[in-house]
């Protein structure tokens, strides 16, 4: 019991010392970059990653050395692009989301260059969507290419069920401090959605249709405190 009490007292003392000698930091910034996304259909749909854009604003609060929190408000394009292999057909369905990730921020390095990891939950709202195609996808069931193929085509005309999405995101990157106030950062991030975009009841075609997105962004932070 004494050992446990001593251990807890020592930990508390270390935390108090760290907080005493470390000055908290508050930074705001902006970022932009590219996204690559797909929809995890089950049964599977032949597709390739759909490229898009992402941009947003960032808030970072660091209370202890090597540890902090980051919140962002981003606009990101997601969706999927059908893979028709050797055919000239083209179909993609793009979603535009407003994202709010809140992540734990862990960093390491020196004053000039730092590496970091971010991990946390994310909630999203779909603001709009659009389909781009070079054929009458509404009539795909009557087209010879699709009647002779075993691929699913129902997703091309299916109505969206959930415009609210939540999931888990995680990323890693590098930050370069230009001086005491300004810094640049490069980050790669992966998002895995936990909500299905399309209906997923037993009578529906797809049992899952969640989003998966990779983003690569370049950002800028300005330190307020």
Question: What do these predicted ranges mean?
Answer:
Residues 1-27, 218-224:
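Bacterial Sec-dependent N-terminal signal peptides
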Residues 19-58, 161, 225:
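Short glycine/proline- and aromatic-enriched beta-strand/turn motifs that initiate or cap beta-hairpins
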Residues 22, 26, 60-141, 178-180, ...:
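Gram-negative (and chloroplast) outer-membrane scaffold detector with strong preference
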Residues 24-26, 47-53, 94-100, 113, ...:
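Residues that define the transmembrane beta-barrel architecture of outer-membrane proteins
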Residues 33-40, 79-86, 145-154, 195-200:
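Flexible, solvent-exposed coil segments and beta strand-coil junctions
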Residues 40-45, 85-91, 155-160, 202-208:
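Extracellular loop and loop/strand-boundary signature of outer-membrane beta-barrel proteins
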Residues 103, 154-157, 171:
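Short structured motifs
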Residues 165, 170, 176-225:
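Predominantly the C-terminal beta-signal and adjacent terminal strand-loop region
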């Amino acid at each position: 019991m004494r050992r446990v009490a001593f251990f807890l007292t020592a930990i508390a003392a270390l935390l108090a010392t760290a907080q005493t000698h470390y000055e908290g930091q508050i930074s705001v910034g902006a970022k932009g970059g590219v996204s690559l996304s797909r929809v995890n259909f089950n049964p599977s749909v032949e597709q390739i990653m759909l490229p898009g854009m992402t941009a947003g604003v960032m808030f970072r609060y660091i209370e202890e050395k090597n540890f902090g929190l980051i919140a962002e408000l981003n606009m990101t394009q997601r969706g999927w692009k059908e893979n028709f292999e050797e055919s000239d057909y083209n179909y993609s369905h793009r979603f535009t989301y407003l994202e709010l990730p809140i992540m734990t921020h862990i960093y390491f390095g020196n004053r000039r260059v730092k590496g970091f990891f971010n991990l946390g939950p994310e909630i999203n709202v779909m603001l709009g969507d659009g389909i781009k195609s070079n054929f009458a996808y509404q009539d795909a069931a009557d087209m010879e290419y699709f009647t002779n193929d075993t691929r699913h085509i129902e997703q091309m005309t299916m109505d969206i069920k959930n415009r609210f999405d939540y999931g888990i995101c995680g990323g890693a990157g590098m930050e370069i401090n230009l001086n005491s106030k300004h810094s640049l950062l490069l980050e790669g991030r992966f998002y895995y959605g936990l909500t299905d975009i399309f209906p997923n009841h037993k009578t529906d075609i797809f049992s899952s249709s969640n989003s998966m997105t990779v983003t690569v962004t370049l950002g800028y932070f300005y330190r307020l405190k």
